[in-house]
Amino acid sequence: SDTLYVLSLPTLVYYYAARNHWPFGTGFCKFVRFLFYWNLYCSVLFLTCISVHRYMGICHPLRALRWGRPRFASLLCLAVWLVVAGCLVPNLFFVTTSPNGTTILCHDTTRPEEFDHYVHFSSAVMVLLFGLPFLVTLVCYGLMARRLYRPLPGAGQSSSRLRSL
């Protein structure tokens, strides 16, 4: 997803350098905005996957062994890309261009008459693709911290024996 996003960056740089003038057409506007959000939310979910993988490695090391296989990782990446793309399909409907004097705007959101619907859509996407993954990441790191700060079994006995000597 990062590679596709990087390929779309020159058009966004041109758009903002030309003071918000979009000469590339509505279809390409939709495509570039889709790539932006696809990259954003795929990155969030991949960071969440990394957090869960670390949690499994620290808190459940034996179970984590079967999840560390390349085939599983490939399928998980494919699932992330497909889920995020599926959630963002409505963005292709909402994003559009509109004339603004002598320039054409490529809206990051939507046209004014669809804005209420867009707010509901983008709020749901934000909760599903940012809020929940962020919560999962926080829980994973909290559980890892608790596990790492817990004394090792038998560690307390050896230190008390040393004190008695």
Curated annotation (Swiss-Prot):
The chain crosses the membrane at residues 1-16, 31-51, 75-95, 125-145. GO terms for cellular component: plasma membrane. It comes from the Eukaryota. Glycans are attached at residue 100. The keyword Mitochondrion does not apply. Residues 17-30, 96-124 are extracellular. Keywords: Cell membrane, G-protein coupled receptor, Glycoprotein, Membrane, Receptor, Transducer, Transmembrane, Transmembrane helix. It holds the Pfam family 7tm_1. It is found in: Cell membrane. InterPro entries: GPCR_Rhodpsn, GPCR_Rhodpsn_7TM, P2Y4. GO terms for biological process: transepithelial chloride transport. Residues 52-74, 146-165 are cytoplasmic. It is a multi-pass membrane protein. One of its GO terms (molecular function) is G protein-coupled UTP receptor activity. Belongs to the G-protein coupled receptor 1 family. Receptor for UTP and UDP coupled to G-proteins that activate a phosphatidylinositol-calcium second messenger system. This is P2Y purinoceptor 4. It comes from Cricetulus griseus.
